[in-house]
């Protein structure tokens, strides 16, 4: 972007990466070909975005950053492709726990800020049933309304600042519901979701008002999804990574 490029120092080689087509043969970006998005270096295709071990546009940019960092070391393309396909992401960071009747169940419990949740939503192409809320730490939730309107079928809210988040959604006509527990919110989201959708825990808040930490919150979410699947006689096909 223009701001970061303005900080270039004279005499230093600069390699850029971004979510658009690269400006030079040495830069990394994303190109569209035959309705398929590819990670590229200049005009050289590195990998189709769909083959990344983790999903979301934000993770595609993370992959591009890693490619740019390894460029000076002449890492073979085949080795890069293997790693990009096999890396399944970090726990609680847009992690695909599994699927239930074609509905992806995604744990993004580490998303404790509006910015983090916005990245998760903007990076997804699936219809999203978002579960959010908790201790907002005094954040302004205004930015969440617009992106939820574009990305979410509904937003299910829990925790101390649920009403504050709801207030940011109302001007955009976003459907939302308030719940007393994460278990209830998870069950309701799974009831509404259909094959091809995703139920996403991305709270935009800290967990301390209801849970020991974000790890505990993630475990409650996973257990709730598994319990709902069992109660409805459906398999919870466990997977790692995110798609």
Give residue ranges: language-model regions:
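Acidic, Mg2+-coordinating active-site environments of NTP-dependent enzymes
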Residues: 1-103, 166, 233-236
């Amino acid at each position: 972007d223009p701001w970061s490029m303005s900080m270039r120092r004279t005499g230093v080689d600069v390699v850029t990466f971004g979510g658009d087509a690269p400006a030079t043969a040495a830069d990394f970006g994303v190109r569209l070909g035959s309705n398929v998005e590819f990670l590229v270096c200049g005009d050289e295709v590195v990998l189709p975005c769909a083959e990344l071990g983790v999903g979301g546009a934000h993770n595609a940019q993370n992959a591009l950053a890693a490619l740019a960092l390894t460029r000076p070391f002449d890492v073979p393309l085949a080795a890069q492709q293997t790693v990009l396909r096999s890396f399944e992401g970090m726990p609680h960071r847009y992690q695909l726990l599994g699927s239930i009747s074609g509905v992806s169940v995604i744990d993004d419990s580490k998303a404790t800020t509006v910015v983090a949740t916005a990245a998760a939503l903007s990076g997804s192409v699936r219809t999203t049933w978002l579960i959010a809320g908790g201790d907002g730490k005094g954040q302004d939730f205004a930015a969440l309304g617009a992106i939820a309107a574009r990305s979410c079928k509904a937003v299910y809210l829990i925790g101390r600042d649920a009403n504050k988040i709801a207030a940011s959604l109302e001007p955009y006509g976003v459907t939302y519901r308030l719940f007393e527990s994460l278990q209830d919110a998870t069950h309701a989201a799974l009831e509404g979701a259909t094959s091809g959708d995703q139920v996403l825990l991305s709270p935009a808040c800290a967990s301390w008002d209801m849970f020991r930490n974000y790890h505990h919150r993630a475990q409650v979410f996973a257990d709730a999804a598994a319990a709902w699947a069992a109660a409805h006689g459906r398999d919870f096909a466990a997977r790692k990574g995110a798609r």
